[in-house]
Each structure stands twice: as structure tokens, then as C-alpha cells.
Amino acid sequence: MKEKAESGGGVGYVRADQIDLKSLDEQLQRHLSKAWTMEKRKSLSDGEDNVNNTRHNQNNFGHRQLVFQRPLLGGGYSNNNNSSKNDIIRSTEVEKSRREWEIDPSKLIIKSVIARGTFGTVHRGIYDGQDVAVKLLDWGEEGHRSDAEIASLRAAFTQEVAVWHKLDHPNVTKFIGAAMGTSEMSIQTENGQMGMPSNVCCVVVEYCPGGALKSFLIKTRRRKLAFKVVIQLSLDLARGLSYLHSQKIVHRDVKTENMLLDKSRTLKIADFGVARLEASNPNDMTGETGTLGYMAPEVLNGSPYNRKCDVYSFGICLWEIYCCDMPYPDLSFSEVTSAVVRQNLRPEIPRCCPSSLANVMKRCWDANPEKRPEMEEVVAMLEAIDTSKGGGMIPPDQQQGCFCFRRHRGP
């Protein structure tokens, strides 16, 4: 799951060993209880009108017999007294689509916090007896955000769910289900059961105990990875991206923070918060979406882009997996942006890197998107690399005869 992560841009990594899990869980319980109470009071004040609406709706919608109106996907509320025939059909379709991915909250138990982000927290949990990760999105207490802001956040949430719930691949984190917050919904914690207010939603996915790939690379920064492991991780990522592209999905935020490792160290792509279906017209896909350092020149430049922006980001990740280091450590975000677009800045490839792997990096981060390979071809190139003779990055204390790093080219 993606969490705000990097330094220099107002975001940072969350170290789980420095989190007071008990305190955070208590804070979450107090916040949810407070928000639920506020929601209930507001609903009761409008109860008479809503009850009348519900009685009217019971004649037409047997599956929506709720005392309080339930928010539709995308943030709006149904107004059945004034709905046109098309609105009724669309509402029914939304309810049907919801059932495809909506979880049963009574089967979900939320446990300790493992990460925190701008709009919520990631918890360990149990769903129907299975270990899971639960992403709780909290859009703020009543009155703290405008209706338009909340609608936008809900739309982003439903976009992530719409993309994720249809995917099935060993290198993509398995989506289990999600829930939109409603007044009649409740969730369980280790300390009991409480209401889930309408400003809180959750996404439930498989739990990957190996954590983020970024953290794994940081831990192995000094000793580096065996070349065979480098290729295995890179192939996992390449196969996952190739699958996404075959489904017409552009991830748009490919980086090592968004890759998770399971107990067998299989890499799985996570966080589809900014993913979207690829537009048939490339001019429909514009805007700076992603993370600086991994973003392709055309994205940084505000030009139209397509799935090849993921290929560029993969090239940066490939370098990072091989080197177990950060690209552009001495440059600011603004310097990176300018140099990548105007000076063709790329990470310095170590001399000890086998030419077969270096060639993959260079092709993937070519400035011209049309010259970058498809991810299917990248998979084939990586599969063809011989790992039997080694070729991994040489640790710093063994680099006597191998000049592996030079200063980064920069502005």
C-alpha cells in the first residue's frame, strides 16, 4: 500500500518499530466513536424525512430498505422522489457492482497499525480467518472538508477499487474486498465493536509479511543482493506490469515503495490509488501523476503519456534493485525534474553491472517513449539473462578493483 514516504517533499517513511501501536489504536477508536456519534445525531435530526423516503422506496427497491440514505459510489446521494428512469437503472447497477467487491464487515477484525498516511492508516487485520492488511481512509470529521473534496476522495477510492478487484495475478497484491462507510455499518477491533462512520472507508488486501521492497533494499544496502535475486525480483515486477498492461491498466506510480514481498519473497505490485484504464486517445492522459525520481520525462513535462511511463519507472526500479541504493541522492526534486527533462539525467550504471542488464535499464528509460520496449519484451530480455556466473553489485568493502560509482550527472 502506498503511504506518503520520501524526504524533501514533506513525506516520510513510517518505521513500525517507532509507532506506539496501542496508543494509535486507542486514538482511532476515539475518533471513530466521535465521528459515528456526530453522524448519528445528524441523521436523527433528518430522520422523519428520511423515513418517509424509505417507506416510499420500499415499494420499488427491495434491496435498499435503509432508514438513512446510503451514499452511492462517487460521493452522491440518491433522491428517489425525483429520480428519472435512467437514474433508477443506474442506481440499481451501482448496487449490483458494489456486491461484487463489498466485504462483510462482521467478518473483519482490525488490529494494530503498521503504517500511517495523509488520509488514513494501514492496519493488520483478520478477514474471515485470513491475515489481511486493512487500509482505512479517513476523510476528516464533519465540516473539515467540503462536499466537493469528499466527493473527489470518494471517486478516487472507487476508482482504486474498480481497477483492483478484477485483477488476478501472482505478482499483483490480491484484492479481497472493500467497504464504503455508512451509518448502519460496524467494524470489529480487538477491543470490541463500533460503528463505521460515512467518512471512513476501507480496502482489504492480502497481508505481505515481507514489507515494502524499498525497506528490503535499504536493509541490504551494504551487502547488496545476489545477481540471481536481482533478476528474480525484477522478473516478478516485470511480469506484474506486463499483466496490468495486458488489462489496459497504467499503474502510473511504479516505485519500490509500492511493491510488497510475501513470506517467500515473491514481489507483488500494490497501491492502485492513481492507476487508471489506458485512454484510447493519449491526449486524455496528462498531468503529473507519480513520484519524482521515477516519473518519465513526458509526465514531468505535462505531455500526453501512455503505459510506456510505467516502463520508464520500471527502468529506475531495476537500477535500484541492482544497486540497493537511491537514485539522485544529492539532488533536490526541482533539480531532478529539470535535469531529467532537459539534460537527459539518468542514474549512473555501475561498471560491474552486466551489459545484458544495463541494456534493459537503458532501453526502459529512453527519453523517447516509442523506443521503450513493451513490458512483455522486458520479461523476455530478463529471462534470457544468465545468472549462473554471478554479476551482482559488489559491496562497498569489496570494491577494490571495481570502480562502481561516479558522481551523478546533474545540473
Swiss-Prot record:
Record's keyword terms, sorted: ATP-binding, Cytoplasm, Kinase, Nucleotide-binding, Phosphoprotein, Serine/threonine-protein kinase, Transferase, Tyrosine-protein kinase
The record ties this protein, via InterPro entries, to: Kinase-like_dom_sf, Prot_kinase_dom, Ser-Thr/Tyr_kinase_cat_dom, Ser/Thr_kinase_AS, Ser/Thr_Kinases-Pseudokinases
Q: Which residues are recorded as modified (Phosphoserine)?
A: 43, 45
Transferase as a keyword of this entry, yes or no, is: yes
Q: Which cysteines are joined by disulfide bonds?
A: none
Please list the coiled coil stretches: none
Task: Return one Gene Ontology term, BP aspect.
Answer: response to red light
Record localization:
Cytoplasm, Cytosol
GO function term, MF aspect, one: ATP binding
| Listed name of the protein | Serine/threonine-protein kinase 54
Species annotation: Arabidopsis thaliana (Mouse-ear cress)
Gene encoding this chain? CBC1
